[in-house]
Amino acid sequence: MLHLYNSLTRKKEPFVSLRPGKIGMYVCGITVYDHCHLGHARSMVAFDVMVRYLRSQGFDVTYVRNITDIDDKIIARASERDVSIDELTAQYIDAMNNDTHALNILPPDHEPRATGHIETIIRLIQRLLEKGSAYVSENGDVCYEVDTFPEYGKLSHKDIEGLVSGSRVEIVKEKRSPLDFVLWKKAKPGEPSWPSPWGEGRPGWHIECSAMAMHELGEQFDIHGGGLDLQFPHHENEIAQSEAATGKPFANYWLHVGMLQVNGEKMAKSIGNFYTIADVLKEHHPEVIRYFLLSSHYRSPLNYSEENLLNAKKALIRLYQAVKDVPPQTADSKLDEYWQEQFNQAMNDDFNTPVALSVLFQLAHEVNKSNSPALAHTLKNLAGILGFLQKDPESFLQSGLAEEEKLVIEQLIAERLQARAERNWAKADQIRTDLLSKGIELEDGATGTTWRRIAE
């Protein structure tokens, strides 16, 4: 049975969906004011694997991942570049789609944008005002009153009294409490705005996600996810406003992905230590990046380094070598039940991908020993749930080399062939040895000599 670590209760719990066989999952997507970095990729890959696994277990998953396309950062960036907000967001949505496609991240079933749900957002704010959970502040903003929700802090387990006492005094001038947050921002000159019962304005970030999640999945759903940095205040605020409006639990399970770090610090645009997905893809195969991102449990911090990416590459090479000579899968090919069960046990333990990867390596060892097509197909199938081992083995094993390097290898193979024709075995053996020392393995066959990269 699947067990998930629920941030709300701080413990692993058996997963029971609201509707048998069906799962509603909402994940906070990106704010499109810049290119996605590898920290975004970690979250997207983690939830991609969760969806793939749940579907492999027979669940009908409705996966929603939003796009925040109106925000202070977007407005500021568009102004800096002297472009329209629509032009800016379209550019980065296209870039995100290119990144996710390259990383073999499945598209969500629904990808709502905040600007497409203004009426839904306004209706939700009206409900909160009617229930006395929100108020119109002196400056014309509509704010949520945190003190009206006694359970505020139940997700992040923050010391709310401490947060209030540590807040800046000037915020209180516009809000009844420093922790109150904006649901609707009064329009400012030159900023995009929409008509509302409270005048022209635009939605706050937190209310956008609640409104879009409810629109796509209903007032209650199974899983809400996002990065650990969103737990407070974003997800805390989502719970407060959603449950105040409906009187029902918002999401039953809250899953949070740990931070990707660089030298012990969170990778973030604000710090300036981030690597864009596009830049990392220039240097590393997409499957290598996926493997690296899954090499640590999704809740644990993961350190970015070239060494860790190299280790991921070596690991994938070993897996590809195990399946490189396997005949194509046929319609009646069956998967090995024992290894399926071992893999499922790992994934049922809160999507424990490091243990699942160790199962794949044990299976690869058995494939190498037995050369069993059934085991090899099982290996490819299980790895496919993690989103890799899906390329042509020869193509992958030759990837990562510049065309000039490939030409040099082909030239050396030709020289070796000539040496063998001249019965100069010493030279032929030396060429093989030299290439092997560079991580290039030669294989002689009836149709000629082929080569592949190997784990050094």
Curated annotation (Swiss-Prot):
One of its GO terms (biological process) is cysteinyl-tRNA aminoacylation. It comes from the Bacteria. InterPro entries: Cys-tRNA-ligase (IPR015803), Cys-tRNA-synt_Ia_DALR (IPR015273), Cys-tRNA/MSH_ligase (IPR024909), CysS_C (IPR056411), Rossmann-like_a/b/a_fold (IPR014729), tRNA-synt_1_cat_dom (IPR032678), tRNAsynth_Ia_anticodon-bd (IPR009080). Zn(2+) binds at C28, C209, H234, E238. A motif ('HIGH' region) lies at residues 30-40. It catalyses: tRNA(Cys) + L-cysteine + ATP = L-cysteinyl-tRNA(Cys) + AMP + diphosphate. CDD domains: Anticodon_Ia_Cys, CysRS_core. Belongs to the class-I aminoacyl-tRNA synthetase family. This is Cysteine--tRNA ligase. It comes from Legionella pneumophila (strain Corby). The gene is cysS.
